[in-house]
């Protein structure tokens, strides 16, 4: 397990004892990520029973660059672009971290799955009101360009988009305001990004959203994907412990 200020609850098969494991690895972090090391934004686990590394991410929400901030027309107090710059630093560092993590997993014969809240919508299909959102944090051109830069058929694949290539959404986040959930005026900012072989093993996937706004517990909904893991094990030539 590797993390930045996060822990994992683990339990051995047949054992009722639950243990909290924490293992911070910050020495090898990209310079831009060191300021985030205590915020619990990332955890990574090598599964014992599958040749698979699973990571969970909570990427900073960010904000608008200073030149787009308009006092009196913002819900948050103008900050001159500080939150925007902080997010951009994270993006630069995390891109390098992903490259290193992919290479390490591949060297060990493991597939890689990175899941979580990326706080970036990649394409027009990922935002219901994309025309009016192009100057909004999470859908800025530079954020979308960054997201595209970490994807390729040979590195990481957006699994849900691969399963639903021409569909609006499926959205994973809706504002609490304006009846956005009932009208499905949402954003797709939560992802499964998988190594190519694992992505090909995905057989179904989408958003597990509540039936009504009254049932919501969060402004996000889980993104759920079913993978045919035996197919991955067979294609890699690896065998799971058994």
Model region roles, listed by residue range:
Residues 54, 97-124, 159, 193, ...:
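Active-site beta-strand/loop signature of hydrolases that rely on acidic residues for catalysis
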Residues 90, 94, 114, 143-146, ...:
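Amphipathic alpha-helical interface surfaces
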Residues 1-67:
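Structured beta-strand-rich core segments of catalytic domains in phosphoester-bond hydrolases
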Residues 58-60, 119-121, 164-165:
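Catalytic metal-binding/acid-base residues of hydrolase active sites
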Residues 3-4, 39, 51, 109, ...:
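A structure-centric signal for secondary-structure junctions around beta-strands
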């Amino acid at each position: 397990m590797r993390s930045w200020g996060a822990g994992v609850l683990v339990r051995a098969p047949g054992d009722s004892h639950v243990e909290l494991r924490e293992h911070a690895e910050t020495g090898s972090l990209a310079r831009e990520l060191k300021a985030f090391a205590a915020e619990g934004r990332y955890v990574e686990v090598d599964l014992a029973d599958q040749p698979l590394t699973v990571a969970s991410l909570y990427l900073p929400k960010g904000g608008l660059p200073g030149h787009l901030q308009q006092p009196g027309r913002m819900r948050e107090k103008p900050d001159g672009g500080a939150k925007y710059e902080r997010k951009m630093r994270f993006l630069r560092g995390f891109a390098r971290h992903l490259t290193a993590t992919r290479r390490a997993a591949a060297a060990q014969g493991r597939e890689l799955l990175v899941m979580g809240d990326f706080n970036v919508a990649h394409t027009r299909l990922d935002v219901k009101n994309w025309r009016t959102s192009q100057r909004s944090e999470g859908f800025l051109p530079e954020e979308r360009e960054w997201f595209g830069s970490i994807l390729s058929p040979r590195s990481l694949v957006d699994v849900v988009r691969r399963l639903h290539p021409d569909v609006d959404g499926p959205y994973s986040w809706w504002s609490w305001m304006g009846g956005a959930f009932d009208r499905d005026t949402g954003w797709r900012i939560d992802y499964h990004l998988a190594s190519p072989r694992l992505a090909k093993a995905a057989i179904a996937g989408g958003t597990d959203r509540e039936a009504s706004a009254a049932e919501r517990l969060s402004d996000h909904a889980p993104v759920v994907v079913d993978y045919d893991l035996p197919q991955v094990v067979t294609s890699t030539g690896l065998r799971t412990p058994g």
